[in-house]
Amino acid sequence: MAATPVPCDLADFARNRITFQSSWSHPMPITDGHELISPHAYAEHGPPHDLWTRLRVESPVHYCEPEGFEPFWAITKHADICEISTQPERFISEPGITVLTDSQRQALDTSAFAAMRVIIQMDPPEHRAVRKVASPVFTPLAIRALDEEMERSARELVDGLAGSSGEGECDFATDVATAHPLRVLSHMLGVPREQEPDILRLTNQLFALDDPELQRKGDDRQQAIMELGLELYEMFDKIIQDRRAHPREDLASILANGTVDGEPLGMMETVGYYLIVFSAGHDTTKNALAGGMQAFLEHPDELHRLQAHPELVDRAVEEVVRWTSPVNYMKRTAVEDAVIGGQRISDGDCLVMFYGSANRDADEFEEPFRFRIDREKNRHLGFGIGEHFCLGANMARRSQRALWLELSRRLEWAESAGDPEQIHSSFVVGLKHLPMRYRIRPATL
């Protein structure tokens, strides 16, 4: 007898995390949610695809109470995530988009981050008004104007891999995947090349609060997070003041001098805009590129397919984003009672939408666990959907496109040179190290 999803009128059983198996007298717990949200679980095991698969079948809207974290409903089906995401008036972002430990929440609430107002934590109508400040810069036409810069970055990085002999070893995650989007974003925001290491360090610290290698150092974690927030604020404040006094033709100036309803964008909103554009824009693309290369190493026939058919590059980009799902989840808070996936959700409940699970949903994707760059129907949620669809999606796509094309033309062969290492993070997921060996062809004019 197959497991039966918990219906509406048995929601109290769902809150006790029970699902019924072959015997009604032996309820078996699926999960308390720890494997879904613990940064260290992701570092050790990677994304929990086996557990997500089970949840999608047995308990697609699953109540979780992981020790040390706030309780939440785990949403694992593609259709349910779309339903929630397209009702921003019922499921809001303002209370927060991540699941935090009590200590993390206390540290963030007492740091400079508490004052920053980031666009992904705004709700309509404010969100739409603030989004319009930068949206003209991220249209497909505007981003295509950056193709030359993206192609230059890709060419220079692959040239660096080639060296004098064309053969070598590298850590693709740090040497290429990290560097490429950083250069593109620095160009857009007018950040000097010499300041890029500081941006990278702070971005790593922001998205890897629990990673022993990347996190801000210090025994007092609350103090470390406070210092991180202050340093980010001071760095962006300098850029904002400069662009207000000396505006240029760049995104930094547009944000620094942005207006909403005829009024200047507030300082905290402006700093928050910088924070999300630079940190999220860099980290997500970096993780897609690193995870994409890992996928190509594990599925060399797909790399050969791209090399033989470069016209598939746009589909390849979409498949890499589906496969890697760099933004693993987003949290929403219900502001009224609702029913999702047959479960009663109460006003005030937290819902965590796991995009990594939705992107392997067999009800949406044919052969979801197969990496294939010629996938035609690919309605993945790697960039989200609805009100908060990724503002920088066009940039992320074109940036990845440039690098995959350059590599497909010049990479003769590549293989793993060691074990990849996962970032200690459950929110933005990916590889911090990907050792590989390779042979690169010389560039052609």
What are the roles of these predicted feature ranges?
Residues 3, 7-445:
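Cytochrome P450
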